[in-house]
């Protein structure tokens, strides 16, 4: 399919998408908010008063949901290489968290506290070529898992977007080594033809 036809199909799907319409009505910054809402409904990831780290946070759909649930007694520390408009209850650091200066900012915001939950909806810029896109996406997931190991408290949780393909089974095994329970979820808001799924890992072993 030509790129123009593919782009046209995406635009048509986007404007007809019920989750896009709902996000505009409900005041969420992206349809991705509903993915986290569903994951949380099923797996009870976020609780009032918790500390949450959101990686790849822009435009802020997941941070919005997390901040609403943790409330005034909790906090959300978010990061992205892209800018993000400020959100109540969210401390945002712009930059690549694999760079030492950015990581230090994030850890400084966390202070003595460890995170209860690390979430990541990161995805690379897709070329449409699976052999190119899959390694890029797996690299981002591995970075997110490393960050979770750095910041999570014992018993904490991790939720991360991943695309099924080469490296997926190995990633699930890697998560099982450091978490007590690992699930693979496909939220309703994930487009059916997408290879996108979410790993939900609970009970960080340390």
From Swiss-Prot:
One of its GO terms (cellular component) is cytoplasm. Its EC number is 2.1.1.166. The active site is at 161 (proton acceptor). It is found in: Cytoplasm. It catalyses: uridine(2552) in 23S rRNA + S-adenosyl-L-methionine = 2'-O-methyluridine(2552) in 23S rRNA + S-adenosyl-L-homocysteine + H(+). GO terms for molecular function: rRNA (uridine-2'-O-)-methyltransferase activity. The keyword Transferase applies. Pfam families: FtsJ (PF01728). Keywords: Cytoplasm, Methyltransferase, rRNA processing, S-adenosyl-L-methionine, Transferase. S-adenosyl-L-methionine binds at residues 60, 62, 80, 96, 121. Signal peptide: none annotated. Its main location: cytoplasm. Belongs to the class I-like SAM-binding methyltransferase superfamily. RNA methyltransferase RlmE family. Specifically methylates the uridine in position 2552 of 23S rRNA at the 2'-O position of the ribose in the fully assembled 50S ribosomal subunit. HAMAP family: RNA_methyltr_E. This is Ribosomal RNA large subunit methyltransferase E. It comes from Saccharophagus degradans (strain 2-40 / ATCC 43961 / DSM 17024). The lineage of its organism: Bacteria, Pseudomonadati, Pseudomonadota, Gammaproteobacteria, Cellvibrionales.
């Amino acid at each position: 399919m030509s790129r123009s036809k593919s782009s046209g199909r995406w635009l048509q799907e986007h404007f007809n998408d019920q989750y896009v319409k709902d996000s505009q009505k409900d005041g969420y910054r992206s349809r991705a908010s509903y993915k986290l809402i569903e994951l949380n409904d099923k797996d009870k990831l976020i609780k009032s008063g918790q500390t949450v780290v959101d990686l790849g946070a822009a435009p802020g759909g997941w941070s919005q949901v997390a901040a609403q649930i943790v409330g005034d007694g909790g906090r959300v520390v978010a990061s992205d290489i892209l800018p993000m408009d400020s959100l109540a209850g969210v401390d945002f650091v712009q930059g690549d968290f694999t760079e030492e200066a950015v990581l230090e900012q994030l850890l400084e915001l966390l202070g003595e506290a460890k995170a209860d939950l690390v979430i990541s909806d990161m995805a690379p810029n897709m070329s449409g070529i699976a052999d190119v896109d899959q390694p890029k996406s797996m690299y981002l997931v591995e970075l997110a898992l490393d960050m979770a190991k750095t910041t999570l408290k014992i018993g904490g949780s991790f939720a991360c977007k991943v695309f099924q393909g080469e490296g997926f089974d190995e990633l699930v095994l890697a998560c099982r080594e450091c978490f007590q329970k690992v699930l693979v979820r496909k939220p309703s808001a994930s487009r059916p033809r997408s290879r996108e799924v979410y790993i939900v890992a609970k009970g960080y072993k340390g």
